[in-house]
Amino acid sequence: MKIIADENMPNAKVLFSHLGDVELVNGRTLTHEQVREADVLLVRSVTKVTKELLEGSSVRFVGSATIGVDHIDLDYLSKANIGFSSAPGCNAEAVADYVFSALSHLYLTKKINWLSKKIGVIGYGNVGKTVYTRFANMGCQVHVYDPIREKEGGSANFVSLDEILSCDVISLHAPLTHTGSYPTKGMIGRKELAKLSAGVTIISAGRGGVIDESALFDRHKQLNGNLHLVLDVWDGEPAINQKLIAIVDIATPHIAGYSKQGREKGTWMVYQALCQYLALDANVISKHDAISAGWLSFVNVSAEEPQEEMLARSMHAIYDVSRDDIRLRFKYRENKEKNVFDWLRKHYVERDEFNTCIIGVSSSDASNLMSAAGFSVDNK
């Protein structure tokens, strides 16, 4: 069996080699000729899996090590009787870590005390729910907008989009959709951005295109720069809006979900799905062996510290988002070509998830807060 896999899928050869011959390829530039004789195609979000790519090939199964599927023509796969699986939720913890690392950065650089602010989350899928739950468990006043999930029921504090736009912190985790009752393409446009007050923080870590970037730039200017922006996703990736880079607080190349464990989980989930599709034993390689432990095992914190200080120090010990911002700005100063975006993703410096680290705390309040933030806790 011939397996074509994106070169940026960690452990792809380790996991899939016992199933067949694995060839690693550049997912962005993948062609029909490369997949023509393949039986299995394993991709990430940079590969558009279409009829044009697959028609006339021998591909019988497509796996995407991602939570989103907007890059997959699901209708064609169904009509062509091609099996498919993605990895929903694989990087939810990683994206939540990104959000809180960014908020910690804003606290340390601008003294934004986000714990006491009104929080709005857009999108209540696997990632949005994880982010929402962390905020809620930390005692924050948190709301969520997702009309589709709201109709399905649930205990989250669902509100209107206008209510979200009145929040102090807005974290976007919606998929990119162009059709249906609630398309998200350009959902946060000029009209919506005009409702934002000065001092609002926007974190965009879902899909590029949900925010109208031109309107965002203009609103930032109208508010005299008093709009705090953290952008991980961009409209037109891998091209990136240079004007926006210049004004945002944090700019990163679609790596919010790029924790070592999150990416490994994505590969692992697709491996499990392929084994099930082939009616093979999926436990030849254990999950324990497939997903790494963290490198930093223990951090001590003092309950005497302000809560935001304690959180920021712990979070940045594991993952400081500003390092990714600095790398992006440096590489774009060197070379403004669009391949910089993919180069940064391919050569990403690995990071661990908060849950791989044990936090040593001396009080029950601090223990509860750090546990709610996603850490493992050791009560001293």
From Swiss-Prot:
Q: Where is the active site?
A: 207, 237, 254 (proton donor)
Compartments annotated for it: namely: Cytoplasm
Alphabetically sorted, this entry's keywords are: Cytoplasm, NAD, Oxidoreductase, Pyridoxine biosynthesis
Main subcellular localization, coarse class?
A: cytoplasm
Disulphide bridges: none
* Residues noted as binding NAD(+) in the record, renumbered to the chain: 146, 232, 257
Q: Which residues bind substrate?
A: 45, 66, 258
Give EC number(s), comma-separated.
1.1.1.290
Which SUPFAM superfamilies does the protein's record reference? Answer: Formate/glycerate dehydrogenase catalytic domain-like, NAD(P)-binding Rossmann-fold domains
Biological processes annotated in GO: 'de novo' pyridoxal 5'-phosphate biosynthetic process; pyridoxine biosynthetic process
- Pathway this chain belongs to: Cofactor biosynthesis; pyridoxine 5'-phosphate biosynthesis; pyridoxine 5'-phosphate from D-erythrose 4-phosphate: step 2/5
Q: Catalyses which reaction? A: 4-phospho-D-erythronate + NAD(+) = (R)-3-hydroxy-2-oxo-4-phosphooxybutanoate + NADH + H(+)
> Which top class of enzyme applies to this chain?
oxidoreductase
CDD domains given in the database record: ErythrP_dh
The record's GO molecular-function terms, alphabetically, read: 4-phosphoerythronate dehydrogenase activity; NAD binding; protein dimerization activity
Q: Which PROSITE patterns does the annotation name?
A: D_2_HYDROXYACID_DH_1
UniProt cross-references to InterPro entries, sorted A to Z? D-isomer_2_OHA_DH_cat_dom (IPR006139), D-isomer_DH_CS1 (IPR029752), D-isomer_DH_NAD-bd (IPR006140), Erythronate-4-P_DHase (IPR020921), Erythronate-4-P_DHase_dimer (IPR024531), NAD(P)-bd_dom_sf (IPR036291), PdxB_dimer_sf (IPR038251)
One GO cellular component term of this record is:
cytosol
What does this protein's UniProt record list under function?
Answer: Catalyzes the oxidation of erythronate-4-phosphate to 3-hydroxy-2-oxo-4-phosphonooxybutanoate.
Task: Give the record's subunit note.
Answer: Homodimer.
Please state which protein family the record places this protein in.
Answer: Belongs to the D-isomer specific 2-hydroxyacid dehydrogenase family. PdxB subfamily.
This chain belongs to the protein called Erythronate-4-phosphate dehydrogenase
Tell me what organism the protein belongs to. Marinomonas sp. (strain MWYL1)
